[in-house]
Amino acid sequence: MEYHGGSYDVIVIGAGHAGCEAALASARIGAKTLVITLNLDMIAFMPCNPSIGGPAKGIVVREIDALGGEMGKNIDKTYIQIRMLNTGKGPAVRALRAQADKVLYQREMKKTLENQKNLTLLQGKVERLIVEDGVCKGVITQTGAHYYAKAVVITTGTFLRGEIIIGDIKYSSGPNNQQPSIKLSEHLEELGFELVRFKTGTPPRVNSRTIDYSKTEIQPGDEEPRAFSYETTKYITDQLPCWLTYTTEETHRIIDENLHLSPMYSGMIKGTGPRYCPSIEDKVVRFHDKPRHQIFLEPEGRETEEVYVQGLSTSLPEHIQRKLLETIPGLEKAQLMRAGYAIEYDAIVPTQLWPTLETKLVKNLYTAGQINGTSGYEEAAGQGIMAGINAAHRALGREEIILSRSDAYIGVLIDDLVTKGTNEPYRLLTSRAEYRLLLRHDNADLRLTELGYRIGLISEERYQAFLAKKEAIEREKKRLQTVIIKPTPEVQEVIRQAGGSELKDGIRAADLLRRPEMTYEHIQKLAPADEDIAPEVAEQVEIQIKYEGYIQKSLQEVERLKKMENKKIPEDIDYDAIQGLATEARQKLKQVRPLSIAQASRISGVNPADISILLVYLEQGRIARVSNE
């Protein structure tokens, strides 16, 4: 029986990593928000690796936190291990990664949602959207409830027509044997959305008590206190190690002999898999010359014996998976607790979205997370917070928010999706960001906290602390520009010990800090500050002074880009009326409908000549409008 379930400002479908951020952002902004999810016990569930962060992804978590999101705070409360990666490299590629206690992570996130003002949680299955005259007005659940809203966000992950595949067995399912969402997928097609079939996979889990850890290498966490969130002040000290082992030639032989049983090679899997997270059979085939591959053994939590066998993602039959485990040092007698599997699911072609993550086809409808063709919890959460902000702003009549490629990795991610699309599950990499020196782990707050505060997601107390930090950085930079360090014997000794060449004359402290071998600690010894300098202030001062030339160069490029971003393209432009455009360019421009010349220039198939023609056309139109006025 159909009935009226209630009216809201925003409805979020799904409470995975995208849905949680979308719902919390919306509610915190002040929109009356409803989250409908298939299973309230699976909020923020980690169906694949029990970790948050890593290269590029860790920076996204920092950005979510700088905007006022939850993922960073939640992992800081629940990790079992944390490490800073790439510490031997430059600041642009450093990133934090934490192993999660996945059950605790879920529990804490559920608690946060339950206690959030303006937020209602509901277990249910959305099967249809209420769409009138191309505008989304709400949702209809399996039980016939009609819920109305001014904006709807779909964050259904890998549940849309999900199918699990192990060997020659294939059955309808969401991740981890949860119920899939079939009717909503069919309904999206009815509305005219183009869907694609993607695939992802997960490795087996084994019982920790049956692993011989003496045959593996220990991988401890960092002793230095670390956190994703700028608000975290308490650090977990009793960390659990991970362990490293390797596949063997015997592992590879078994895979080679049984490739015909792999659904990837038998033709059973039609969906495109993630390039940067290949299955073990894929690795063995593609890198046949490699005698071994790394396998990390990652505990899934403090209260469980389940261990995630990272690097052994597979959809081979279960009996073959058991044979593979027996060939890996340390896992010879490991008990299989859950078999690895592949999952195929529907995703929306993301060029059907505006940069706000609103769909072009249906107004007031937003999508975020794996439904948009991405892979990874962090990518999902980054889209979730932006979709939640924009949905709430639409409902409350506020301006839309779009992060540019020079603002954040989240901006790079969304721009790549809506401008270029993706023909495989999209993973964020540092190499995708042309301004990666500006988009660092250490400066996410300096880039985004101002915006988070303006939107209403950052508290006054946190904002004041942020302003104090900013002022302290500027004060110390100014001091180092004026203080002169003279070539005294003590100074020469410090420089010699650091591996540098001695001073001939006095030098400004900032210029000495620019030398590769010198650190801020050295400068503090030679020219101590009058005030206590917090470690995060010292870090910023050192990076900003050391890399000043490169940063300035990047900022000049950003200014050039902004000029192109400011050249707006009307939404209702008729590309068929523009003479001289190449056929491919015309087709791509009509499909993507870019909002600026900068976005148009990033579409594959649109050449500089096409951009010139487009610029002339827009200029002629502007002149015509001015003369008519």
Curated annotation (Swiss-Prot):
InterPro entries given in the database record: FAD/NAD-bd_sf (IPR036188), GIDA_C_N (IPR049312), MnmG (IPR004416), MnmG-rel (IPR002218), MnmG-rel_CS (IPR020595), MnmG_C (IPR026904), MnmG_C_subdom (IPR047001), MnmG_C_subdom_sf (IPR044920)
Residues the record lists as binding FAD: 14-19, 126, 181, 370
Alphabetized SUPFAM superfamilies for the sequence: FAD/NAD(P)-binding domain
Residues annotated as transmembrane: none
GO terms under biological process: tRNA methylation; tRNA wobble uridine modification
Keywords: Cytoplasm, FAD, Flavoprotein, NAD, tRNA processing
Record bears the keyword NAD: yes
Residues annotated for NAD(+) binding in this entry: 273-287
UniProt subcellular location: Cytoplasm
Keyword tRNA processing: yes
Cofactor(s) named in the record: FAD
Single GO cellular component term: cytosol
Gene Ontology MF annotations: flavin adenine dinucleotide binding
UniProt family annotation: Belongs to the MnmG family.
NCBIfam families linked: mnmG_gidA
PANTHER family per UniProt: GLUCOSE INHIBITED DIVISION PROTEIN A (PTHR11806), PROTEIN MTO1 HOMOLOG, MITOCHONDRIAL (PTHR11806:SF0)
Subunit structure: Homodimer. Heterotetramer of two MnmE and two MnmG subunits.
Described function: NAD-binding protein involved in the addition of a carboxymethylaminomethyl (cmnm) group at the wobble position (U34) of certain tRNAs, forming tRNA-cmnm(5)s(2)U34.
Protein name: tRNA uridine 5-carboxymethylaminomethyl modification enzyme MnmG
Organism from which the protein derives: Geobacillus thermodenitrificans (strain NG80-2)
